A protein has these predicted regions:
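P-loop/Walker-type NTP enzyme "switch/lid" segment
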Residues: 15, 45-117, 227-231
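Post-Walker A helix-loop "phosphate-sensing" segment adjacent to the P-loop in P-loop NTPases
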Residues: 32-41
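Hydrophobic positions on the alpha1 helix immediately C-terminal to the Walker A/P-loop
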Residues: 25
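Conserved lysine of the Walker
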Residues: 22
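C-terminal lobe/tail of nucleotide-utilizing enzymes
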Residues: 173-277
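Walker A (P-loop) phosphate-binding loop of P-loop NTPases
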Residues: 18-19
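Single conserved hydrophobic/aromatic residue that forms the stacking wall/gate
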Residues: 1-8, 12
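Conserved catalytic-core segment of NTP-binding enzymes
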Residues: 110, 117-118, 128-214
Length: 277
């Protein structure tokens, strides 16, 4: 099993403000790892709101959820849902009905250990927005964190707050071992709007947060289309967004990829004359 820590597989979480594309990113990132042959699980930590299974297209298959496993009302094997698109990807849904207090540190740790012992190479923890219990639980056991943010001041401020919590409350911070490895993922990025001064540039965001950039996801309607179809956008062939997520997975796995979708290409004279955008 691959991992940053000596204790088997890595645990990944993603965080940020509501609506920044965390769950979309979790679904596509986990799917991208599975497409690369990695046995991967993705866990929804948003108790009460549950939407990862909708984006993954498996909402009708949910019988048991993470809280059932924590309360020993079901086994992990019973609760895990096999993904429709990737044989080596499994989803652990959140509970729609339970109280957030049912999410205990001991219970989450037991699930993660069982997953590691079952041969999962990567465990992606999809964190809810803000700093509520589910978010803190998702980051507690992280080996690496992908901070998902929009290029807007309020979103970047929220991400800065989350970085503070990771650096103070993660198990790695508490035990004084090597800190959680942090990555910055900027979503809904429009170089044209950056050029017009309507949006922070990726350099601005990096300057504020001071963590390494793992990738940029361009603003695109294909994300909404994919969500409505219950298909992670990484599966949409030939779309910029799909290519961007594949680049992120490659960088995460240690491969070099040029940074795409970051610069505004002004339309040429002919396209302006003939009405191109």
């Amino acid at each position: 099993t691959q991992g940053v820590s000596s204790a088997a597989s890595d645990v990944y979480k993603r965080q940020g403000k509501g609506g920044v594309g965390k769950t979309t990113s979790s679904a596509s990132f986990a799917s991208g790892l599975a497409l690369r042959g990695k046995k991967t699980a993705v866990i929804d930590f948003d108790v009460g709101l549950r939407n990862l299974d909708l984006i993954m297209g498996c909402e009708r298959r949910v019988v048991y959820d993470m809280i059932n496993v924590i309360n020993r009302e079901a086994t992990l094997t019973q609760a895990l849902i096999k993904d429709k698109h990737c044989d080596n990807l499994f989803v652990l849904p959140a509970s729609q009905t339970r109280d957030k207090d049912a999410l205990t540190e001991e219970g989450v740790e037991r699930i993660l250990e069982e997953m590691k012992n079952s041969g999962f190479e990567y465990i992606v923890c999809d964190s809810p927005a803000g700093i509520e219990r589910g978010a803190v639980m998702a980051l507690t056991f992280a080996d690496e964190a992908i901070i998902v943010t929009n290029p807007e001041v309020s979103s970047v401020r929220d991400s800065d707050r989350i970085l503070g919590i990771i650096q103070a409350k993660s198990r790695r911070a508490q035990t004084g071992v090597e800190p959680v490895k942090e990555h910055l993922l900027i979503t809904r990025y429009s170089p044209k709007r950056v050029e017009a001064g309507e949006m922070l540039s990726y350099e601005d965001v990096q300057e504020i947060l001071r963590i390494p950039l793992i990738g940029i996801i361009p603003e695109s309607e294909s994300v909404l289309h994919a969500s409505n179809q219950g298909t992670p956008v990484v599966h949409l062939a030939d779309s910029d967004v799909s290519e961007a997520y594949k680049d992120i997975v490659s960088r995460f796995l240690g491969e070099d990829r040029p940074l795409r979708f970051a610069e505004y290409e002004k339309p040429g004279l002919l396209s302006r004359i003939f009405g191109g955008k």
